């Protein structure tokens, strides 16, 4: 099966090309912290020769608690993104939650993301498709990998074939997520070769069944990421924070920022190895 290439400016994303890092912070906590984190990612990825896209949310509209921090909002968030682009020359990915947000956000960033909980909302899909922007679709925790083909078809029917798919784990009973490594190949197949990436951070979430925030398994981020990269993926999606314990969202799953370089050294080594193997068809 021919693998589709999605171009983000000078960055090419495909399952058989060197992996792209979609990395940053969970939510924009402040302008200064966003600048600090983005600068660190840029420095490390340039040193290692890894194509890089900065990620952060301007609004976490799906927090468990009404009292949880959501972010600076659309207007202030777009200002921060514009400054990051001017300062560091980075491409940016962020999520949208309503049809009305799609075009204003696409006017600023390079990739707009369809959140997992909203992935079947047709009005939102149609609005995002109309922007012509590159789309990243998060696989819902409650949806099988094979069902992702229907979401891709919605975007293509809406005139947008610039679609990336992202796995972030699947429900395993109550309050737990697992990653089905066979699902990556299924998503490649049902999307006819669309780029597939792995959100290792959110796949590490686990919940207190009566709590107001997600827990996480940060200590296992490297082993889970290694497993995903061994499949042969278009990209890795990860969040890091200089002080995960005090992060405003999903700190228990975030990679400590100072561990980013040694972490990526390992991921690049696995990606280089796997993508230098000759094709091996075991179906026949």
UniProtKB/Swiss-Prot annotation:
GO cellular component, one term: cytoplasm
Keywords: Cytoplasm, Lipopolysaccharide biosynthesis, Transferase
Family: Belongs to the KdsA family.
HAMAP family: KDO8P_synth
Coiled coil: none
Species of origin: Edwardsiella ictaluri (strain 93-146)
Catalytic activity reported: D-arabinose 5-phosphate + phosphoenolpyruvate + H2O = 3-deoxy-alpha-D-manno-2-octulosonate-8-phosphate + phosphate
GO biological process: keto-3-deoxy-D-manno-octulosonic acid biosynthetic process
Pfam families with a match to the protein in the record: DAHP_synth_1 (PF00793)
Pathway as given in its UniProt record: Carbohydrate biosynthesis; 3-deoxy-D-manno-octulosonate biosynthesis; 3-deoxy-D-manno-octulosonate from D-ribulose 5-phosphate: step 2/3; Bacterial outer membrane biogenesis; lipopolysaccharide biosynthesis
Name of this protein: 2-dehydro-3-deoxyphosphooctonate aldolase
EC supergroup of this enzyme: transferase
InterPro entries in the record: Aldolase_TIM, DAHP1/KDSA, KDO8P_synthase
Main location as per UniProt: cytoplasm
Parts of the chain that traverse the membrane: none
GO molecular function: 3-deoxy-8-phosphooctulonate synthase activity
Compartments reported by the entry: Cytoplasm
EC number in record: 2.5.1.55
Keyword Heme appears in the UniProt entry: no
